[in-house]
């Protein structure tokens, strides 16, 4: 497909009530915006990944999945043509879907490994295992270098409480850069800095976001 869309379709008649269609309602989530759009020039290389996400908690429709959520301001979904096109050219090939014939991708939780470097705060690895939160005092700037110790393909799940008007920036990289813009040994961090794709979160000040 060269344009985005969404289709939910059950395999049996039991799921028909949940199938996507004209009865669905939609809204544009204003909490999300692209960031890290200049990584090609920053890293002086060709980038083959999309931008990062800038997420503003005070614009997110919290509770949208709850039964009593007020969706009066949402619009009716626009139903497109058939999603299956066997052949065609031009506009008849904008939204093209076909059933997958291969297994689903692996999905499991991975927790980050260790804290390699810290600035502005003293911490331990217990918060990485989920045993207790990392508490950052107000009007404080901290920096943590977290090492997974192996390369992986994953997406970030972060839980935030309070911290209204704070900024949380997560930068991802396979290795650090030295003063000559070289990566070298991935295990070495002394005198090196991180450059890479990043996401930014702006908490709304509430609990367990």
Q: Model-flagged regions — what are they?
A:
Residues 1-209:
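Extracellular/oxidizing-compartment recognition motifs
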